[in-house]
Amino acid sequence: MTTRNLTDEQIAEFREAFSLFDRDQDGNITSNELGVVMRSLGQSPTAAELQDMINEVDADGNGTIDFTEFLTMMARKMKDTDNEEEVREAFKVFDKDGNGYITVEELTHVLTSLGERLSQEEVADMIREADTDGDGVINYEEFSRVISSK
């Protein structure tokens, strides 16, 4: 998502949020201002982490975030959230009984309905490959890791 895809309403909300971060109202968010807001939200980032967050979007290299850079950051975060929702929806397709795990049977059922003809052993191999904790099923974190690595 780019800043062009943001609605006027979203931009207005982000301007309001920006002014909360920009405590001295100089049009820029410093690492100190970012730290104050994050600590008020229960986070405890280090000075280096705060600077890294700023550097990620600091297009002009001045060490602070202006409103345009802030919009870029928020648009990226929204895109990440959209991707997360898509992965959750995909997980639900596989997790037929909704118990939070994908079993060999559930994976076989979905693959068969998609026209894939795999043996139980091939499906079990797929589960084993994704099953990092070795419990014989795929939980959401394991599923997300496999999907995100593609």
UniProtKB/Swiss-Prot annotation:
Chief subcellular location: cytoplasm
Binding of Ca(2+) 2, residues: D58, D60, N62, T64, E69
Stored Gene3D superfamilies: EF-hand (1.10.238.10)
GO-annotated cellular components: cell cortex of cell tip; cell division site; cell tip; central plaque of mitotic spindle pole body; central plaque of spindle pole body; cytoplasm; cytosol; division septum
Domain EF-hand: 9-44, 45-80, 82-117, 118-150
Binding-site residues, Ca(2+) 1: D22, D24, D26, N28, E33
One of the record's GO molecular function terms: enzyme regulator activity
Family the entry assigns: Belongs to the calmodulin family.
Protein name per its UniProtKB record: Calmodulin
